Amino acid sequence: EDAHKIFDQLKSNNKLKEKICIMGRSLGSAPTLELCAKRSDITGCVLESGYADPIPLVERRGLKIDKTTPEENALFNNSQKIRLVKCPLLIMHGADDFLISPHEAKLNFDNAGSKIKHLEILEGVGHNDMMMQHSYFTTLKRFFDSL
């Protein structure tokens, strides 16, 4: 909800005029997908080190979640929400990410509703060092140039 309010405020103030690409990293992938799934005025979506399903992610940290409501699942389950994303999509993930497995990036990619979608698994990259790779910026530039 907050992401929509901020986006609407920026649009109403003419701060967002041309092509708009929304990017979310790690837990920020959830509000990114929330926007991209529900808005038609977004040109592109980038997910960096995003999760697919929050339950296994939380349980790997030692917390137990017994039950979620359908509303909670709809809000936080990226692998379901990404089905509604129609804009071009780039998913980037580190092959050595031990916090959020690269398998989750593959799940998101497989479930994505976008007709134009790219999955980039960067070798030798973990969860917090992706920006240090030259290929990171090359990949982003190639995607942005294609929009």
PLM region descriptions:
Residues V125-F137:
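Catalytic histidine-centered segment of alpha/beta-hydrolase-like enzymes
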Residues N14-S26:
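Alpha/beta-hydrolase fold nucleophile elbow
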Residues L84-K86, I91-H93, D97:
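Short beta-strand/loop motif that positions the catalytic acidic residue
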Residues N78, C87, S101-D110:
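Short alpha-helix in the alpha/beta-hydrolase fold that links the catalytic acid
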Residues E1-N14:
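Alpha/beta-hydrolase active-site loop
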Residues V46-P56, N77-N78:
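Active-site nucleophile loop of the alpha/beta-hydrolase fold
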Residues K106, D110-N128:
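Catalytic histidine neighborhood in serine/cysteine hydrolases
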Residues D96-I100, H127-D129:
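Acidic catalytic loop of the alpha/beta-hydrolase fold
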